[in-house]
Structures are given as C-alpha cells and as structure tokens.
Curated annotation (Swiss-Prot):
Binds 1 divalent metal cation per subunit. Can use either Co(2+) or Zn(2+). This is 3-dehydroquinate synthase. It comes from Neisseria meningitidis serogroup A / serotype 4A (strain DSM 15465 / Z2491). Pathway: Metabolic intermediate biosynthesis; chorismate biosynthesis; chorismate from D-erythrose 4-phosphate and phosphoenolpyruvate: step 2/7. CDD domains: DHQS (cd08195).
Length: 359
C-alpha cells in the first residue's frame, strides 16, 4: 500500500492506494469516520462491493445504512441528489454521520455535494471504484451535479476526510470505462510531466492489462500531481485550472451528445487533442506533438477526434464553461508536451480553424 497526504487550507487528509484495501476499509478509515456512516453507491457497484464494505465496517464497530442509486452520468442531477437526501433523512442521519461514496466519479461527485449541503455540512470519505475516480475526481474536493445547459454547473469545493483506492476494483471495470479513466492518466503527463508522459508511452499495454506494479505507480503519480496542485490552489483561482486540460471541449461534447452518450474520459480524450490543435494554431506546439498525444490516447482505446456538430453549438456550450471570465473564454493549452498554460481566446476564428475538420 502507498499513502500520500493532501494538504489544503481547509484541512489535510490521506489517500490510501493499493490492492486488497476494501476488506480493510473499516480499520483504515475508522479514524476518519463518525460512529455512524451512510454508504452511497449505485445499482452496478452494490452487488460487487457493498457487502465487503459492510463487513469491514461491522468489524470496526461502525454502524451504517446504505442508499443505492441508479447508475450513470444521466442520473447526476437534482432528482438523484434528492434521493440521497431522502435516504439520509429517513434514516435520521445527523451532521456527524459520515457519508461514504462507494463508486465512480458520478457517485463521488454527488455524495460530496450532498455532504457539503446536508445540514450545512457533513463529513464524507471517498472509496473510488473506477480508474477515472481513483486518479482524478475523488481527490481535491470538487463536488457537483449537472444542469441541462452545462456539466458540473451546480456544486461546491468540499474536501473529503480520506480517500481509499483499492485497485482490485478495476478488475470488474468494463474495458470502455478503463479506457475512459486512462484519459485522465494521460492528461496528467500531458499537462505537467513529460517524463511521466514518456513512461506511459512505454507502459500502456501493461497498464491496460492491469499489471499490478505499473498500475499502482501510475495511480500514485496522478494522485501525487493532483495533491501538489490542489495544495497550491484549492479553489481553482490559478494553476488548478490546468487540470481542466481537454475539459472545455470535452464538456461541450458531453452536453451536446447527451450526458452518458460519450463517457467523460472519452470526451476529455478528444478534448485534449482539440486543446493541442488550438495550441498548434497559436504556434505553441507542432503537429507532430499533437499526433504523438493522439497516438497515446488511441493506444489506450480512446477517441482522438470529437463527434461532428455545428460550430455555433460548440460556442454555445463552451460559453457556459466555468473558466469563462468577463465573458472571455479561457482554455487550457500547451506550451509543449508536459507543460500547460491558460489561454484567453477573444477571436472565435481561431476556434473555428481548430474545429474545422469536425464541423
């Protein structure tokens, strides 16, 4: 097991990364739990891992109840959030009841937002069961639900008490979901660590085969990078925006196609290539750099091109992006592979040129 600590102005918390951790969840997490816990999970994860977690909590003397939600990005909304609140109130959850998110990014985001708002703030912990959530969404305190006009538009910054990432849960992950998570792994190398990017180029087959040693190394490096960035910029006033590489274009894809049609990681993959193409247009990187990024994404089973839709739709969706400031769109671009930047775009013609092959 590897452990690292996330330090933020609000508080610090541990991330536990390894294999076979879920049966130890009671003992590992007990210092970070109240006397009672609410497990929030979904219909897919519950049959696989809920029983193991319940047994672990019983052994640690933590009482608990469970709330099982429908699965999928299409359910990341007010209606499903209210199911969490209904379950908490029906079970007389108190402010010190710890919410436990057992699932992927959707469960983690919604559980965190429920925790941030239930009785004005209850503690929560993350037990991410997908690669995407283990390397990205479970760490850093971003919580949200979607709105029909934009992804993650309603939410809060609210840090968990702990994160427990059991890599064994990835063995039940569908291949498409594994690839989607790998998009976020590749994103980290692309935005801030060229040596990690090169390591991914060398080890992608082993990672996709879930070989234990390279997998734990990759997950640890991603969490380490995110922890370092979040420590500097908890509420995304500056450098943390780099973690949104590919997300401005990616969220536009998800919104246009309907939440869940393209998985988040698939949209981010295509979005990263578009961000690279935009950086090409600005003279920052070469076409060869963009091709190299696209090749790595494709090696992970990911799309390197977006779906085709009208330029006006792209602009409409991207105008709702959370990085927009003073009406000016801001994109995360690249100075080079391994180094991101924040780019303000006032001339939409450059966006049209970037997107032209896909209009």
């Amino acid at each position: 097991m590897k452990t690292l600590t996330v330090h933020t102005p609000s508080h610090s918390y541990p991330i536990f990364i390894g294999n076979g951790l879920l049966p130890q969840a009671g003992s590992l997490l007990k210092p970070h739990l109240g006397k009672r816990a609410a497990i929030i999970t979904n219909e897919t994860v519950a049959p696989l891992y809920l029983g193991t977690l319940q047994t672990a909590l019983d052994a640690a003397g933590v009482s608990h109840f469970s709330i099982i939600l429908p699965d999928g990005e299409a359910h990341k909304n007010w209606q499903t959030l209210n199911l969490i609140f209904d379950g908490l109130m029906q079970n007389r959850a108190e402010r010190k009841t710890t919410l436990i998110a057992l699932g992927g990014g959707v469960i983690g985001d919604m559980t965190g937002f429920a925790a941030a708002t239930y009785q004005r703030g209850a503690p929560f912990v993350q037990i991410p069961t997908t690669l995407l959530s283990q390397v990205d969404s479970s760490v850093g305190g971003k919580t949200a639900i979607n709105h029909p006009l934009g992804k993650n538009m309603i939410g809060a910054f609210y840090q968990p008490q702990a994160v427990l990432a059991d890599l064994d849960t990835l063995h039940t992950l569908p291949a498409r979901e594994l690839s989607a998570g790998m998009a976020e792994v590749i994103k980290y190398g692309t935005l801030g660590d060229i040596s990690f990017f090169e390591w991914l180029e060398q080890h992608m087959p082993e990672l996709m085969a879930l070989e234990r040693a390279p997998l734990i190394q990759a997950v640890y490096r991603c969490c380490q990078m995110k922890a370092d960035i979040v420590a500097q910029d908890e509420t995304e006033q500056g450098i943390r925006a780099w973690l949104n590489l590919g997300h401005t274009f990616g969220h536009a894809i998800e919104t246009e196609m309907g939440y869940g049609t393209w998985l988040h990681g698939e949209a981010v993959a295509a979005g990263c290539v578009l961000a690279a193409r935009l950086s090409e247009q600005l003279g920052k990187i070469s076409a060869a750099d963009t091709a190299r990024l696209a090749a790595l994404l494709e090696a992970a089973g990911l799309p390197s091109a977006p779906p085709v839709f009208a330029f006006e739709k792209w602009l409409e969706h991207m105008s709702h992006d959370k990085k927009v400031s003073g009406g000016i769109m801001r994109f995360i671009g690249l100075n080079r592979l391994g180094e991101a930047n924040i780019t303000e775009i006032t001339d939409t013609d450059i966006l049209r040129r970037t997107l032209q092959p896909y209009l």
